[in-house]
Amino acid sequence: LFSSSSQEERDNLYGKSKKEGRELMIDWAEKAGGKFTGMIIPNVFGPFGHPNYNSVVATFCHKLAHNETPTIEVDGELKLIYVGELVEAILSEIRKGKSNAELVIAHTSESKVSQLLSLLECYKAAYQDKGIIPSINNTFELNLFNTFRCYMDIASHFPVKFVEHTDPRGSFVEII
């Protein structure tokens, strides 16, 4: 199995090197009689990605969770796949036991960079800042929310202090 990138189609050094690497592995497999599958993978996101490396989701989550302000360089359209969905696609391909020189892994969601940042800002404002679970409308949003949560500084965030309300009848706190 060889992991390549949807960047293969772009005219940049990274994309060219990924495509060339995949093609070299295809040649090797043919000459050596080996099996080879070259996966072309969209933008992967999920818990514990490396910020400031190759995932805008990881970078935005890390910055927001640490009270930094992310910036958008290019507000492009992203084709995304959650890491768990990618693992399922890889396992499915392994179970087939066949070579596939160019296996395009389908993206499972799309988002403009600005829309992605807006959702993450809502998660921070609701969950991290106020302790409110945000509205989750689909699987993508659930995966994105869970990704955001892994970047929070858990030691300083929890336990959450509840606001006590008191009147002549007694005291109570609101919890989820």
Label the model's feature ranges.
Residues 49-59, 73-95, 112-118:
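Substrate-positioning beta->alpha
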Residues 1-25, 29-32, 36-39:
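Conserved Rossmann-fold NAD(P)-dependent oxidoreductase catalytic core, especially the SDR/UDP-sugar
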Residues 63, 67, 93-96:
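Generic structural signal for alpha-helix termini and adjacent loop/cap motifs
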Residues 39, 105, 175:
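Hydrophobic residues at beta-strand termini and immediately following loops
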Residues 26-49, 62, 68-79:
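Conserved beta-loop-beta element that borders a ligand/cofactor-binding pocket
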Residues 160-176:
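C-terminal, non-catalytic macromolecule-binding modules
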Residues 89-164:
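Mid/C-terminal beta-alpha module of Rossmann-like enzyme folds, strongest
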